[in-house]
Regions:
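Alpha-helix-loop-beta-strand connector modules within alpha/beta enzyme cores
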Residues: 64-84, 140-153, 231-234
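Acidic/histidine-rich catalytic cores of soluble enzymes
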Residues: 6, 15, 20, 82, ...
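Active-site groove signature of glycoside hydrolases
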Residues: 114-132, 161-162
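An active-site-proximal structural segment forming one wall of the substrate-binding cleft
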Residues: 96-119, 139-150
Length: 277
């Protein structure tokens, strides 16, 4: 039952889609999402950060930071995590030269720290996937060089990866567990055909963030319950590791722009599983 008080949604999931993108910062509607989330009984919103016009995002603008704080307090919606789609859109670990990108990363860490955001999700999937060994080596060197800065700013980096369970464990063990962890995405793991029991066996103790979605094996994101995710088993395993952090809905979008209603359907589905598990 504790999980019910940890539910939240990805920013943009309670707003109309922009340019037909499944996920992007809802520049016109981000304020309204606080009241929408409150009305749905959610406790968290996970902030999103795109590479395009990155520093126009409210987390970098003093006046808008104050608005975020006021809305968060007014509607009792916490912002404890940020998904950096900007990293996936412009993966600096695939570049020979990356000085500016690392400088930008430190600015993002600072902005999150200012707002009391604790977790930054770095997606190592799709365009951000570590396809070459040198990508991985470069990423490890860069992020490990930031440990003292992360400690000072009280930030934890969460990697979301397409690595198989054993390989992901070997990867995450190359980082200090006080400042790094894994963001587990239910849908992505199901789409890749991974065995959820093996995943929790190999790296369950490193999971510090969760994205809830459903996907078809090797296929698209679908409404919860219509894909290959075994949510009953997932929540039993999540309970077994004594997971206490936020659980963020990154679910399929409504096909007719009724996103709040779509979230309501998904929330009902997961709430029932949690109560009966």
């Amino acid at each position: 039952m504790k999980f019910l008080s940890n539910l939240g949604c990805m920013q943009g999931r309670l707003s109309p889609m922009i340019n037909n993108k499944i996920q992007s910062f809802p520049s016109l509607y981000w304020k309204e999402e606080f009241s929408n989330a409150k009305n749905l009984g959610l406790k968290f919103i996970e902030w999103t950060l795109d590479y395009d016009q990155i520093f126009s995002n409210p987390i970098f603008i003093k006046k808008k930071i104050q608005q975020i704080r006021k809305l968060s307090q007014k509607y009792s919606i916490k912002i404890k995590s940020l998904t950096g789609d900007c990293f996936m859109q412009n993966p600096f670990w695939k570049k020979k030269r990356h000085t500016r990108e690392v400088s930008d990363l430190k600015k993002i860490i600072q902005a999150c720290s200012n707002l009391g955001i604790k977790f930054i999700v770095v997606p190592l999937v799709d365009n951000g996937s570590l396809q070459e060994l040198w990508h991985e080596k470069k990423l490890i060197i860069i992020f490990n060089s930031l440990v003292n800065f992360l400690k000072k700013k009280k930030i934890i980096i969460l990697f979301e990866s397409d690595y198989n369970p054993k390989r992901l464990r070997n990867f995450i063990k190359k980082f200090n567990p006080d400042f790094f962890g894994i963001n587990y995405d239910t849908g992505n793991s199901a789409a890749l055909g991974f065995d959820v029991k093996k995943e929790f066996y190999y790296y369950g103790d490193f999971i510090k963030g969760v994205h809830i979605k459903d996907r078809i094996l090797k296929g698209k994101t679908v409404r919860l319950g219509e894909g290959n995710v075994n949510f009953k088993l997932f929540f039993r395993l999540l309970k077994s590791i004594k997971y206490k952090n936020q659980i963020i809905f990154q679910t399929a979008r409504s096909e007719n722009n009724k996103d709040v209603q779509e979230m309501k359907i998904n929330l009902k589905y997961i709430s029932k599983i949690i109560k009966n598990n």
